[in-house]
């Protein structure tokens, strides 16, 4: 137990270290050249956008595709003309599904509420009298809505997704050679391994979540400034702390 407390204190010291601002993301002390990511890790692509349309609590997105049944312009889920369930439209992004502004910072409560509304509309009991084709479409829509909610709920996956929408695919597995960060991660993993009770684990978890939030905040600053190289580095650091949280949850 004494050793565990010592390791927890070590992590506390790590958390209290001076945290680099976004402007410092690309140069941690004197090791800038070691942390520079290769350009090959960034792949650009274009993304299609639909038009948001709101009616009461109904949030949907229209695309250029017409209804498969009647040919009218169809919404994300149901055709407004014949009420046929529509197939998944890949041009509708995750933010549009929930009627959210396309930005990194979101309201978790709003996301959860709209997710539940979508799931009610897609519940098997409500579509059981539809054709097999439409029931299959409903199942596919439900899977996409669930994946969209899961992606937008977590800081890391949301950061990667919004970067993708802006034409940058992030390889979060890119090897980081920053010795300072690698030392922090090594000490963090050791602390998690040595922790032998829920109190110690929850204490470490709280500190790791603080670190994760700090890098998340730096990502926001870099992303909004369109400093995508810095944003990528923030995401890769967020990846390490996200995995640390997962390791802790497995032990709790």
Swiss-Prot record:
Tell me yes or no: is Transmembrane helix among this UniProt entry's keywords: no
**UniProt GO cellular component terms:** cytosol; mitochondrion
Q: Where is the transit peptide?
A: 1-59
Q: Where in the cell is it found?
A: Mitochondrion; Cytoplasm, Cytosol
InterPro entries per the UniProt record, alphabetical: DnaJ_domain (IPR001623), HscB (IPR004640), HscB_C_sf (IPR036386), HscB_oligo_C (IPR009073), J_dom_sf (IPR036869)
Give the phenotype of cells or organisms lacking this gene.
Floral stems lacking the epicuticular wax layer, distorted leaf trichomes, and under-developed siliques with shrunked and non-viable seeds. Strong reduction of the activity of iron-sulfur proteins such as aconitase and succinate dehydrogenase.
Superkingdom of the source?
Eukaryota
* J domain ranges (all copies): 93-165
Q: How does it assemble?
A: Interacts with ISU1 and HSP70-9/HSCA1.
Q: Supply the NCBIfam families for this chain.
A: hscB
What is the protein name for this chain? Answer: Iron-sulfur cluster co-chaperone protein HscB homolog
Q: Which gene encodes it?
A: HSCB
